[in-house]
Amino acid sequence: MTRFVTGGAGFIGANYLFYLRGHYPDDRLVCIDKLTYAGNLSTLAPLLGQPNFRFARVDICDREAVYGLFEDERPDVVVNFAAESHVDRSIADPSLFLQTNIIGTSVLMDACRKYGNVRFHQVSTDEVYGDLPLDRPDLLFTEQTPLHTSSPYSSSKAAADLLAGAYGRTYGLPVTISRCSNNYGPYQFPEKLIPLMIVNALADRPLPVYGRGLNVRDWLYVGDHCRAIDLVVNHGRIGEVYNIGGHNEMRNIDIVRLICRKLGKPESLITYVADRQGHDLRYAIDPAKIHAELGWLPETRFADGIGRTIDWYLANRPWWEEIVSGEYQTYYARMYGDRPMA
């Protein structure tokens, strides 16, 4: 089988490629990635040079290049991780998010139609549902929750989801969609909360927390997410949406304090900064459907997963030190350097 993984040099995509190689050693894997700031070719070093692995530096919006890859490789399945995914960046400049997340997805699905009605899986986010109140812990996102986006990022992902559903209904494309809660684990770019706090704490730098840090997120270890996607791709019902959640709800401030404790760093490093515009209060996913239909449940408790993640960043300093030494510093200064205190 030939599998296309778009966005495979990014955090979740790379972990998914490693998962596939471990479980399907004879399959041909083709990684398609534009190598934006969040894509890192060094992450894929264990796969590069393998005879049944190909890396293609291609923008999914480049129709000619995408069609050329389909012509060469004739994939059996496409799993689309390729996306601009950081909410703050989408607020600063929505245009790239609309282009990559919507137009890029349509180009991929057009290629799937053109080259044999290829199986297509769209990786999405719980952010398409909006947010939940902090005082109603009984409320969870289900697959029936209406789409109610809060940011240009989540709006672009919701549009891509709707487009995928439309391609399934209009053209008969075999499509599935998964929507996950917040991921964490190895190889995550340090603009996201957990790796940002780990990297800053290790350097004794301020730990910027939006508002008072009371926003709640449901945390999903990336390995559990990869296993869930594999089940949906292989056994999910065509045309269906599957929510993937970690059953690990935590306030942002509690995560930051936990990281400080595990690294032996003082909480005085925590710096409260002005809140994000339209900051969602709480995300929490009900994974009952994927459990009932496919037998999936998260296996990684947050206490174990965060320890594993911290250990990885401690053991792989060269990977993240290279990232934080370049263009990222300019972005970091723009996002946090001039932000007023909360």
Residue positions per predicted region:
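N-terminal Rossmann-like NAD(P)+-binding domain of SDR-like oxidoreductases, especially those catalyzing
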Residues: 1-183, 308, 313-316, 322, ...
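C-terminal substrate-binding subdomain of Rossmann-fold SDR/epimerase-dehydratase oxidoreductases
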Residues: 3-4, 58, 195, 201-342
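Residues that form or flank phosphate/diphosphate-binding pockets in enzymes
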Residues: 12, 38-39, 64, 188, ...
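Short aromatic-enriched loop/helix-cap "lid" or pocket-rim segments at secondary-structure transitions
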Residues: 41-44, 132-135, 188-191, 255-256, ...
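Hydrophobic alpha-helix immediately C-terminal to the catalytic Tyr-X-X-X-Lys motif of short-chain
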Residues: 159, 163, 167, 197, ...
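Active-site helix-initiating loop/hinge in glycosyltransferases
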Residues: 185, 189, 218-221
